[in-house]
């Protein structure tokens, strides 16, 4: 087989090398969840530029086990060179941590107005949001009227002054002005949106819910656990609800981060997976009889080390990757269009790489998904003259694949 397997991060976590702070303040480290404690690329990106006396704040507001989640990340930071005595846990949560029976973390719900907790934010050079449920974080940091609490104002002031803001999973979802709060792809494409104050039992299933975020990233939407939870469809549906100029989505894989340098106008992928970039600014979409369709979407993917210009979404592949232009692929096989557990599992990167751009005989790829009632969607990915891929380290960079979504009805009958 031509392509090697991506080497995983192994062994003890590396100590991050301290470097002088750059002249580009206010970076964002937006992690897709399930970040390994040994993932030096992600954790070192978060602490990059910290001086020996600089402090870090950890905000566990999204977690259902706030104290445990905070202490876990304190240990991770310590493994990457940040002494625990330089780390402040911000007491902000909305549910009790059952692992600490002597402490009721639900009592921290109002601490976004507490001077002692706000002071932890004000002295931090880097601030991290743990994972959990993003609605918990916004419930704690936004007032009932949607305005910012004093702690959120302090967070925005620190970010403007150069502090790094990072977060994983739910901590990534809150980064934008509008955030994805609930839903899965198939339901998002076949059911109407639900109100941001509606009750829904799970974050990962059901109809799409959008809600106000915290607004650190002034562009588009972020989705996380992206490839493993098949969230391309829900991201496309969510983007259709934004103003046209804002319709840029970033889908961050697990154990991976998008590192955004707002001052320089660039973003870089770091970690074990990739970051999908979905451009829907020129897309045409419709919702008819609760079925979503869209055409004119453009899909790209950053592999680790790739850089993205935020101004024009141009991708610069990391050094050492081999470029693959249309018609120049290694493979020559008919791509399968089915899905399900009887077929080999294939992520987005391999579908767009092995089956499309790195495949000399394929310029179009279809994938169909459907539920038990037969309501389904067809994804169509097409190579264009602007498309190219790059391969290195077992990872594909993908540039400018045309993408469309069409509702379908599927009937399944037993063979005679």
Can you name each region flagged by the protein language model?
Residues 18-20:
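N-terminal signal peptide c-region/cleavage motif recognized by signal peptidases
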Residues 24-54, 58-59, 63-72, 77-82, ...:
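C-terminal and late-domain segments of enzyme folds
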Residues 63-64, 72, 84-117:
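Functional beta-strand-loop-alpha-helix junction segments that form "active/interaction loops"
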Residues 116, 120, 147-162:
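Catalytic-core regions built around general acid/base machinery
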Residues 128-131, 154-155, 159-179:
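Catalytic nucleophile loop
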Residues 134-148:
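Glycine/threonine-rich flexible loop motifs
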